[in-house]
Amino acid sequence: MHIEVTGRGPDLVLIHGWALQGGVFAPLVQRLADQFTLHLVDLPGHGHSRDDTTPLRLPFVVNAIAAATPPAVWCGWSLGGLFALHAAATLPKVRGLAMIAATPRFVRGEDWPHAVEPAVFEQFGRELASDFGGTLERFLALDVMGSAHAREELRTLRQRLVERGAPTERALLEGLRLLESTDLRGALPTLGKPSLWIAGQRDRLVSPAAMQAAAALALGGQALTIAHGGHAPFLGHADEVAAALQHFVAGLSPADGGQ
């Protein structure tokens, strides 16, 4: 699995969302590389890991990333948040958890109302085979919908989608299955390490209410909503997201994390 390492300082693992790759975090790299050693993951089937055969399932991916990185804070965006949360719940070496537009459960249920209907991800899966490019374009449009900087963010995501080669259909389908079926809420009350939940106020995929509910389930969880932000708030509001991550990591004690 390809993991780009850049910067200097405390270690921070960044995991991208569905269909993208680690380069999507460029605005955060520009702002954080002087304070952090950043580990930018390309998930299997995406970017420079396009030919990686690791199954896109939580334990396989998390163990592969953990084997290649030192003790660190893990930060996941959207789908990437499921990997980061699983790591925080299972690995002592994870010092803290930052979730950007990511919750432990992405689909709606009777006891989890602030989420999308399962049919949303099911439809994307059905459409991939018949209209690969169009399906990805529609998903990118959802990523930026509502953001105050939607046009610029969509242009950036389109560039990031193809600059390292398109993701594989297999990886996209595996990612959709994770989004449809994963429920990690049970891990939150016993998480045992600090967590930060960063939402975009105008996010159409993951509502701020869901982020706040997740933070409330995690002991000591902190919730932050980026005003006018969409599903990728680190693009149009990179200064605010970077500052939040800096403040969060600075507040961690040396006891947070292990070997």
Curated annotation (Swiss-Prot):
Catalytic reaction equation(s): 6-carboxyhexanoyl-[ACP] methyl ester + H2O = 6-carboxyhexanoyl-[ACP] + methanol + H(+)
Keyword Hydrolase: yes
UniProt signal peptide: none
Amino-acid positions noted as binding substrate in the UniProt annotation, renumbered to this chain: W18, S78, L79, F139, L140, A141, L142, D143, H231
GO BP terms: biotin biosynthetic process
InterPro entries: AB_hydrolase_1, AB_hydrolase_fold, BioH, Carboxylesterase_BioH
Keywords in alphabetical order: Biotin biosynthesis, Cytoplasm, Hydrolase, Serine esterase
MF-aspect GO terms: pimelyl-[acyl-carrier protein] methyl ester esterase activity
Entry similarity comment: Belongs to the AB hydrolase superfamily. Carboxylesterase BioH family.
PANTHER family (alphabetical): HYDROLASE ALPHA/BETA FOLD FAMILY, PIMELOYL-[ACYL-CARRIER PROTEIN] METHYL ESTER ESTERASE
Oligomeric form and interacting partners: Monomer.
Role, per record: The physiological role of BioH is to remove the methyl group introduced by BioC when the pimeloyl moiety is complete. It allows to synthesize pimeloyl-ACP via the fatty acid synthetic pathway through the hydrolysis of the ester bonds of pimeloyl-ACP esters.
Record's protein name: Pimeloyl-[acyl-carrier protein] methyl ester esterase
Annotated organism of origin: Stenotrophomonas maltophilia (strain R551-3)
Protein encoded by which gene: bioH
